[in-house]
């Protein structure tokens, strides 16, 4: 029943409606277009100046976080959750007493919305607010709402009210496709909790769900926990690369970018050394997921997890991964040969390529072959220029403008958070984006998109505007310069804005399927598509200007940057295929035919090609097994779809308004309210096959010979 509001970095970065003109149906249902506000200012300037104290309205009335009156103090979370729980009780009563029909689905959605509005907001505040009191209060609210959701998902009367609707064929046939899909999604949530089982099995399902939550939390903590080794066991000259603690050296990561081969090797072997407790936790997590899936009627956890996705089932996922691996194998071998050549050049004594080598040596090759030192690019990518670039692109593609709006006192959690109003040229205000872009103490390091409030059509005909947060970790401005982004930071900004536009334009009738609340292998398509725009010179040329001289970024610098990303890209993609395959096997048929480490060894040798290192257990650090269990392939599949959309719709003209409107209408407007493959078909005007997806990914690896011609001129 509860939506998860966060979309973070998956993969290399580490979230049915009848066809209609996007946004029109809802507007015609009675929404009044909002006029442009006089308090809005141009977006570029807002990000290249430091916020003044006055912009936070120091003497005005305190509004509360995100304008929620109760949240002007940490204690307000208790009031907000109590209010939501009271409303939930009333709505449960209404749902159980209302005759089955479309109204049943509306009540369920309002129930979901009343809980999500507190839970999603709290989910963000508990990790992002600088004040511990706010974080703790938000954590408690998450727990309280989570308990309520567990109760609702096992409420037999509530389940029966929905089952009566879906069991009546005549009633179901009378529902519009979006309403029917939302009803089925709510039913899916119920059945995952085992509500359709007898009392004893239902209790077992609830117990397994609780156990899985606890094991997931324990596994995540263990995945990031450092390992230590006695000092005398490490060569003296590499000890200074690690943290000391008495007689021990602490290893807290892989040190993948270290130029010293021995440092990388030591970090790899020590950080990935098996921990018996973590191993037991993973085994229990996988077997508990399998037991739960079987209990509620699925042959494997993977079959359960892939319901409603583009792939639909594990067989399709494995076909996709195996075909992709076959197509990559020759290119991957060439990449490893290139890495071996560079390693031999720098370290003639030991040129064998090991798993700790590719990230470092591919970076060396990139730097040698293309002059792409980030400091050459940063002056052209001031944050204000990049935001203006996004504004230009969104305006030309979708008729959307971003305006900076002054937040009220207490509305934001840090004075450097900017608030953007998202405004359509004819439809008016679509929603708000809060930009939490800058580094600060205790802030999570991952770039993320959070849904704070989902959009939905309210009973009075007005539309509940979506509210999201984009969280990045950019350096602050200095006395002499505004915030300057590396090319990677600029691409991440475009990526996260892709999620935000999905939230703004996925204007569904129901909150349960609004914006990014869609299957995982579709959710990354809008964000990855934005990366293609960020790497196109015609787009970059609109905004990349030197912050001091105003000079545009030369075309050959953009081309070199794009081509440099293809260095060892096949090996990088092959690594993702290995991870995704391992994830599928772990969540496939149980009992597993071997230990998780033996399966890792087999899979690494078959799907990656570099040797397994004895006495290591990389799977115990694979934290994505928790959030993306059986769905790690999603990033690759989303990239394949985004690549096809780019090539077929935007490659000829990245500012094509007709293609932009079609993209909104076919892919963004439905949120999760339509089957993802139907949205892909609508956009591409064909039903892509697994071979099409594989070809799209592989063709992206081909070098663009225009770059070499330009550089040789």
Swiss-Prot record:
Q: Where does Zn(2+) bind?
A: 495, 499, 502
**What span is annotated as transit peptide?**
1-35
Q: Name one GO biological process term.
A: peptide metabolic process
> Which Pfam families does this UniProt record tie to the protein?
Peptidase_M3
Principal subcellular localisation of the protein: mitochondrion
Q: Does the keyword Lyase apply?
A: no
Could you name the domain of life of the organism this protein comes from?
Eukaryota
Q: Which GO terms describe its molecular function?
A: metal ion binding; metalloendopeptidase activity
Asked if the keyword Glycoprotein belongs to this entry, the reply reads: no
Query: Which reaction does this chain catalyze?
Result: Release of an N-terminal octapeptide as second stage of processing of some proteins imported into the mitochondrion
One Gene Ontology cellular component term attached to this UniProt record is: mitochondrial matrix
Cite the InterPro entries for this sequence.
Answer: M3A_MIP, MetalloPept_cat_dom_sf, Neurolysin/TOP_dom2, Pept_M3A_M3B, Pept_M3A_M3B_dom
Where found, per UniProt?
A: Mitochondrion matrix
Q: How does it assemble?
A: Monomer.
Query: Which function does this protein serve?
Result: Cleaves proteins, imported into the mitochondrion, to their mature size.
Report the protein name in the record. Mitochondrial intermediate peptidase
| UniProt source species | Pongo abelii
Q: Which gene encodes it?
A: MIPEP
